[in-house]
Amino acid sequence: SPEQANVLIHRQRPARRQVAGVWRASNGRTQLQVVDVQRQGRRRLEPLVKVMVSPGLRAEALQATALHELGHAFGLWGHSSVPTDVLAISQGERPVLVPSQRDRLTLEWVMQQTTRFGSTLRKPIEPAESESPE
């Protein structure tokens, strides 16, 4: 259910945003919010990730954009300089529809890192919000 999900996917065009003084549109965007929740009698930190993908894209571009944004949702916040990676900074002529070996290895590394998500909290935590660089 959406109330329990950590990742919510929306078919909506992300708002344009200003980058280095220039307004830019994008096919997708991911926003991370760290929330203080109460579950099973315990307070803990959980990620709440909103993924937005423009609905008007052709099928391959929509799939590639969704895969790229899900990479951000799963913790890959940076971009790759290699155009054949899902997390390449922009889609080339041929959208990447399958994660590369580099993408998979990076995700495996991220998943092995320690996190405070799920830990019991004793003091209130101020919410934080972050947005992917596209």
Identify the role of each PLM range.
Residues 8, 49-53, 84-96:
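Surface-exposed aromatic
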Residues 63-67, 84, 104-108:
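Extracytoplasmic/secreted envelope proteins and their assembly/folding machinery
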Residues 114-115, 119-134:
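Pan-zinc metallopeptidase signature
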Residues 1-70, 77-80:
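Metzincin-family zinc-dependent endopeptidase catalytic domain
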